[in-house]
Structures are given as C-alpha cells and as structure tokens.
UniProtKB/Swiss-Prot annotation:
Gene giving rise to this polypeptide: hmgA
This protein's record includes keyword rRNA processing: no
Catalysed reaction, written as an equation: homogentisate + O2 = 4-maleylacetoacetate + H(+)
Family of this protein: Belongs to the homogentisate dioxygenase family.
Active site (catalytic residues): 303 (proton acceptor)
Organism for this UniProt entry: Rhodopseudomonas palustris (strain TIE-1)
Lineage of the species this protein comes from: Bacteria, Pseudomonadati, Pseudomonadota, Alphaproteobacteria, Hyphomicrobiales
BP GO terms, sorted: L-phenylalanine catabolic process; tyrosine catabolic process
Protein name: Homogentisate 1,2-dioxygenase
Job of this protein: Involved in the catabolism of homogentisate (2,5-dihydroxyphenylacetate or 2,5-OH-PhAc), a central intermediate in the degradation of phenylalanine and tyrosine. Catalyzes the oxidative ring cleavage of the aromatic ring of homogentisate to yield maleylacetoacetate.
InterPro entries with a match to the protein in the record: HgmA_C, HgmA_N, Homogentis_dOase, Homogentis_dOase_bac, RmlC-like_jellyroll, RmlC_Cupin_sf
Annotated binding of Fe cation, by residue: 346, 352, 382
C-alpha cells in the first residue's frame, strides 16, 4: 500500500510552528485543516463553519480539578454517533485483559526471546500478543503489556480503546498512526501515546514492524515531579509533539473495532471516521523521542534508584505509588567512584516488565536481546548476572559512556500475571535463572 497516496488533508497550528506537530506536554492546543474551521470565543456555535458538527471528547470527569481536567472539542464531518452502528462481539485473537488467569506456571523470574516476524499477513489488531496483565480493566486500575507483530497496514479498518490509553514502543520498523486528531509517525527509540476513546488505524512505513505496547487502564500518563532536581532534565515538555489536524472526506465502507470491558466489538460504517477538520483542547495523542531524554545520575558515588529514569507516570490514588511508571535506560555516563555501577541486587514491592529496543543492557549482557523481554514480579529477587558482577567488581573505575543502548521498563504496583501465550509460545527461556548460578560464596570472616 502506498501510504503517501492516502487522501488526508493536513492542517496547521494557529502559530504555524513545527509543520505536522505542535510542541508541548498537556498544552491546550488548537489546530485546523481548513481556515476558519475553529470557532472563536466559543465551543459550540449554533452553526459550525463548513457544515461541521461540534463534539466534545472528555478524558476526565467534568468536575475533575482544573490541573487534571482533560477534554478536547472536535469539529468533524459527522458526529461520532454516526460511527456506532450495531456492534457485534468478535474474536480477540491473542489480546487479553486483566484479570486474566490462564496458566499454572510457578512464580519465577522470567525472560523471553524476541518473537520471529511471522510470514502471514497480520494487521495491528491481528498482531497483538498479550504477555502480562495486572489489576482489573473494569475498575480502571492496572495495565497490560503486549508485543505487536505487524506485516500489513490496516485498510478500511479503524479502532479505538475504551479500556485504556495505549503506549506504542517500536523496536523494529516504523509506524504511521492515522488518528482523528492528526497523523503521528514513529520509529524505534520513539514512543506514541493514544488516549482512550480516540479512533485510529495503524499503517506500516518501511516494512514489517515489531514492538511493545503498554495498555494503561488507570490514570493518564503524565510527567513525574522533578522535586529537588528542579525545572530541567529528564523528559522536557517541549520535546513532546502533538499532531496538527488532518482529515479524510472518504465515503467508502470501513470497519470500526472497539475494545470495551475486555472484549472486542466491530461495526460497519459507510465512511471513514477520520473526519475531524479542526480541534482544540488538551486531550490528544502525542509522540516523544526517547533520545531527547536528559538523564540525571550519581556524579560522586553509589547507584541511584531506577525511578530517576522515569519518563512518564500513571499515578494511583496512593501518593508516590504508581499505577505504571515508564522508565528508560538510555545512553549515559557512568562515573561513580568506589561504586558497584550496574543496578544492584534487589527485591521490590513493584512488578517490573522490561524490554530492549536496541543495544546491550548493562546488568544483563547475555540473554536479554533486542525485541525480547523479562519479568521480575513483586518480591522476587533479581539483579546482575555473574558476568556483569565480575566485570563491575573488578573493572577499572574510569568514566565510561554507555552508548548504543535503549532499554525500558513498565513498572506497576500490581502483580503481573503471565498469559498463556507468554507461557507456551516457545519464547520463554527455561534457563534464565541459571544466569545467577555462577555467583559463589565470597564471604571470608578473616579478610575484611
């Protein structure tokens, strides 16, 4: 499919800055694909320009505090009630939602090889493989982690997720996310977040694609507090990009899929739902380049907690306890003196799902490869393998720059339950726990 031939009409921001995208996190944006499509000084005029319909999309209750209130006004060719015919329940494939109890694996530290790219034709919806679920989709708490394998673009198919917002983390191949708010293109080392309720389709850009997907049932991702770090570093607001308006006036049959309550439903439409000509508000999809993250670390001694690398957080009702933290381990300098520099041995109240986009992870130089994954559930010990321990314990402590690496972690307060696919797909490494077998007793009471 030639994606460049699709009949989208691109818009612009009112400031005409950064063609294709508007800069900022959580801003109140405004953008129009036709001049004058946005009403001035009001949200729902008696008659909208160009014969459009005004529609509000709310991502929070009306009475949420102003700082947490999320909504956008859309000016579209048809209202969304015309996008919802008679829905029929349809097969979910390998997509699962919490709570999900499918296997009888004993508790353990787990690690998976990357899945091979399939030969059959798989769209995004067909290519989702759920690895873990946590919490409960019906109480809007918790998350699910998925892999995606895509070998063909969605054509005359669209989707929205009522259960949660979705974070795409490409590992191989680029994606073009055609949303009703505009068009987002992402490549490995970039992420995109599509809030719940926003319609989109997934297209391939440069061949088959593989990556990770976090489905957030809880509070929307937001930037973490910096505390004494101050006003700069970590993920800076200006580096987040939201698309300008783009629309299709396309009267061809299409299917609309909706994930709702852990099930998948489908309806048929006689037209494309990507028909928003203009919009304004702060509830919108966005992208972020992980390579713009400015890491902060120890410049004297000791290894800081991994929370120092948080990009985005989904807060829970308990202050300081995340529904999800999205954490990365990017290129950085290691300079701490008289210090064991890799991540230390650890038991944690949080449950950690890790993936590797490219390069080598410093605590696991073997076995944890790009496209693979690991799971260290709550209160299960983990840490460097024998090779990493020996190297870090005996190596010269000169400044070292970790280059060509990008690992990440989805960390949640809830136990992550492994799906049947994750347990029996053949990707699970049976010998993962053996990586610690070489750690010998080193204690000698006669040698301090």
């Amino acid at each position: 499919m030639n994606i460049n031939a699709a009949p989208q009409i691109l818009g612009r921001s009112s400031q005409d800055i950064t063609p294709g995208y508007m800069s900022g996190f959580g801003n109140s944006f405004e953008t129009e694909a036709l001049p004058g499509a946005l009403p001035v000084g009001r949200n729902s005029p008696q008659r909208c320009a160009y014969g459009l319909y005004a529609e509000q999309l709310s991502g929070s209750p009306f009475t949420a505090p102003r700082g947490a209130n999320e909504r956008s006004w859309l000016y579209r060719i048809r209202p969304s009630v015309k996008h919802s015919g008679r829905f029929a329940k349809t097969d979910m494939g390998l997509w699962r939602s919490a709570p999900c109890f499918e296997h009888d694996l004993p508790i353990a530290q787990l690690r998976w090889d990357p899945p091979p790219m399939p030969q059959e034709k798989l769209t995004f919806l067909q290519g989702v493989r759920t690895m873990t679920t946590a919490g409960d989709v019906n109480t809007q708490a918790g998350m699910a982690t998925h892999l995606y394998l895509i070998t063909q673009s969605m054509v005359d198919q669209h989707f929205y997720n009522a259960d949660g917002e979705m974070m795409f983390v490409p590992q191989q191949g680029s994606l073009r996310l055609v949303t009703e708010f505009g068009i987002i293109t992402i490549e490995p080392a970039e992420i995109a977040v599509i809030p719940r309720g926003i319609k989109f389709r997934v297209e391939l850009v440069d061949g088959p694609a593989r990556g990770y997907l976090c489905e957030n049932y809880g509070g929307a991702f937001t930037l973490p507090e910096r505390g004494p770090i101050g006003a700069n570093c970590l993920a800076n607001s200006r580096d987040f990009l939201t698309p300008v308006a783009a629309y299709e006036d396309k009267d061809t049959p299409t299917e609309l899929y909706v994930k709702w309550g852990g099930s998948l439903y489908v309806t048929k439409l006689p037209h494309s739902p990507i028909d928003v000509v203009a919009w304004h508000g702060n509830y919108a999809p966005y992208k972020y380049d992980l390579r713009t993250y400015s890491p902060v670390g120890a410049i004297g001694f000791d290894h800081p907690d991994p929370s120092i690398f948080t990009v985005l957080t989904s807060p829970s009702e308990t202050p300081g306890t995340a529904n999800i933290d999205f954490v990365i381990f990017p290129e950085r300098w290691m300079v701490a003196d008289n210090t064991f520099r890799p991540p230390w041995y650890h038991m944690n109240i949080m449950s950690e799902f890790m993936g590797l986009i490219y390069g080598v992870y410093d605590a696991k130089p073997q076995g944890f490869v790009p496209g693979g994954a690991s799971l260290h559930n709550m209160m299960l010990p983990h840490g460097p393998d024998r090779e990493a321990f020996d190297h870090a314990s005996n190596g010269e402590l000169k400044p070292v720059k970790l280059t060509g690496t990008m690992a990440f972690m989805f960390e949640t307060r809830y136990p992550q339950r492994v799906t049947e696919y994750a347990a029996s797909s053949g990707l699970l490494q049976d010998d993962y726990a053996d990586c610690w077998n070489g750690l010998e007793k080193r204690f000698d009471p006669n040698r301090p």
